[in-house]
């Protein structure tokens, strides 16, 4: 199903849905902490059509999980398509259930994700870690009356033990919940969010924000959203900047994102991003 040995220098190479499920089951049935730290690279796009997905990494208790994922998952620019989760009684719902100090990078997800609370396209919950160059195209929903922290990238970020870094990420999926954000539904402290954008509709019954729905920090920089994309009912982030559909379409937002990239010598991630033009903004 996979090649490699799961280390930083020789990560598992995964190219199929069967291989992805094998990895998920290895993490969720880990007998030692090291088994939750295994490293993965995707070598192909993966289609999960016909699969009701169970998340990678299990959130236990209120905010954290002993079987949370703590390794490095590198999508290598690939997409996990047709992700499907419909569990309105579950918390920590997403491709990953709970990430504890891990790294998720270079990954796009599409499909539909529904949970009770702590629900995200990439991860339902996170305590620190790094999420970079990730994109959510999923419709993401959680309970709009209780709990209901919902985000395009991360549903709920506690950041009790680790610093959370989110950079070069975007959402174009529809996000709905009690506390809803295009990138993160709710986060507490110790986070830095930079160079991200939202062009998906975000609806929150308590709090809504284009980047973060409800939060306790203002460490947001160079983040943008499509004007009118947030259906706001209190709360929401105030550090992101609204841009018109014209500014998305004419390259203005693209250039702002490229200017904010960490590595000026690398290929600009914004050049590869979809949905930066009005013509592209379709699901």
Model-derived regions, located:
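Surface-exposed repetitive/solenoidal architectures
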Residues: 1-283
